[in-house]
Amino acid sequence: MQNSHSGVNQLGGVFVNGRPLPDSTRQKIVELAHSGARPCDISRILQVSNGCVSKILGRYYETGSIRPRAIGGSKPRVATPEVVSKIAQYKRECPSIFAWEIRDRLLSEGVCTNDNIPSVSSINRVLRNLASEKQQMGADGMYDKLRMLNGQTGSWGTRPGWYPGTSVPGQPTQDGCQQQEGGGENTNSISSNGEDSDEAQMRLQLKRKLQRNRTSFTQEQIEALEKEFERTHYPDVFARERLAAKIDLPEARIQVWFSNRRAKWRREEKLRNQRRQASNTPSHIPISSSFSTSVYQPIPQPTTPVSSFTSGSMLGRTDTALTNTYSALPPMPSFTMANNLPMQPPVPSQTSSYSCMLPTSPSVNGRSYDTYTPPHMQTHMNSQPMGTSGTTSTGLISPGVSVPVQVPGSEPDMSQYWPRLQ
């Protein structure tokens, strides 16, 4: 039975679970980093996980050691009161100082060594604690504590007292930064006198190289990059290397530039699409467009005044059976039934097929058609009795279509119309 579990990581490298990497692998990681390889490249070359490479390099940059820390136990506290007071002093002298600059000053002034120097995250935590204590304490208590930490007896009751030896409130920041720059020169002199001055200088240079600022491109470089971006948004590694040799930039910087440029292009394309949609959409909808001609068919113009009344309900007709019959029939052209047409008796099958359309009241044959006459024609229609054979009435077949029909004066039988409509 094995005491430890061995495995293979996602890159194909072998590791022992819970145990640190061998010293030979750690040394190779540092050597590759000094030669300029990126952590992701080191991870692929040595088949070590990216997190492990970053952790080893980060500890090497901070402490200069590649040895693993002790497994188990607690780390001794490195942010001692003396170190905290120095950090507060540096922050007062130059409020814009960075944590890694404070760390360098602690090393250069001999406050800490490589073994007990606090990390950048520890210094940031100390600065946050100082800021929170400043908010919790009152103004007087804060000034007393700062005077105690600074070891001075001057008056701290006013704002300019934060910067000793100065009279203009805006000047101390520059003086403090100048003092810090002077301390940086002392850093070089002190570290050069040490035993491991060369190694420390190499480590600091490598650290500065990794902690780079934003790349500033010249106009020629920007023009070359934009020209390549117009050709393709995704250049391959050969195109990037050719462009890197042409404009004297690292291939990694060119790759990052193209990634950022593609993101910018997507944002601009989104804005262009929004403007295009806004320009195509009308600002207001016309009133006429809300009524579609496919839904509402136009009603033909009436030929006679009587045809303006298109349904039985508008003429005072309360018989719903006839109203439904007229509205359900398709529109037909106007025609006239003459008196000489043969009077065919209704076929029983045809009569039964339209039995649902006729009223059940037996008085329908005896009703006159003056009910369908509009009010303004009552006088004219009353002067001509319906009993004469020459009287013409208008029957409504569908809305908007008038059918003048000659009705025999002897017997106005409704059943004569249905064979004609089939």
Curated annotation (Swiss-Prot):
Listed result of changing C52R: In AN1; shows almost no binding efficiency; transcriptional activation ability is about 50% lower than that of the wild-type protein
InterPro entries recorded: HD (IPR001356), Homeobox_CS (IPR017970), Homeodomain-like_sf (IPR009057), PAIRED_DNA-bd_dom (IPR043182), Paired_dom (IPR001523), PAX_fam (IPR043565), WH-like_DNA-bd_sf (IPR036388)
GO molecular function: chromatin DNA binding; co-SMAD binding; DNA binding; DNA-binding transcription activator activity, RNA polymerase II-specific; DNA-binding transcription factor activity; DNA-binding transcription factor activity, RNA polymerase II-specific; DNA-binding transcription repressor activity, RNA polymerase II-specific; histone acetyltransferase binding
DNA-binding region residue numbers: 4-130, 210-269
Cell compartments where the protein resides: Nucleus
Effect the entry attributes to changing P118R: In a family with nystagmus associated with a variant form of aniridia
Region (Required for suppression of NFATC1-mediated transcription): 345-422
Region (RED subdomain) location: 82-130
Pfam families, sorted: Homeodomain, PAX
Keywords from the UniProt entry: Developmental protein, Differentiation, Disease variant, DNA-binding, Homeobox, Nucleus, Paired box, Peters anomaly, Repressor, Transcription, Transcription regulation, Ubl conjugation
Sequence segments annotated as region (PAI subdomain): 7-63
Cell inner membrane as UniProt keyword: no
Effect of Q422R: In AN1 and ocular anterior segment anomalies; loss of DNA binding ability
GO BP annotations, alphabetical order: animal organ morphogenesis; astrocyte differentiation; axon guidance; blood vessel development; brain development; cell fate determination; cellular response to leukemia inhibitory factor; central nervous system development
Superkingdom field: Eukaryota
Main location (coarse class): nucleus
Substitution effect: Q378R: In optic nerve aplasia
Residue ranges, annotated region (Disordered): 162-201, 269-311
Phenotype upon changing A321T: Shows about two-fold higher binding efficiency than the normal wild-type protein; transcriptional activation ability is about 89% of that of the wild-type protein
Subunit text: Interacts with MAF and MAFB. Interacts with TRIM11; this interaction leads to ubiquitination and proteasomal degradation, as well as inhibition of transactivation, possibly in part by preventing PAX6 binding to consensus DNA sequences. Interacts with TLE6/GRG6.
Purpose: Transcription factor with important functions in the development of the eye, nose, central nervous system and pancreas. Required for the differentiation of pancreatic islet alpha cells. Competes with PAX4 in binding to a common element in the glucagon, insulin and somatostatin promoters. Regulates specification of the ventral neuron subtypes by establishing the correct progenitor domains. Acts as a transcriptional repressor of NFATC1-mediated gene expression.
The name this protein goes by in its record: Paired box protein Pax-6
UniProt lineage: Eukaryota, Metazoa, Chordata, Craniata, Vertebrata
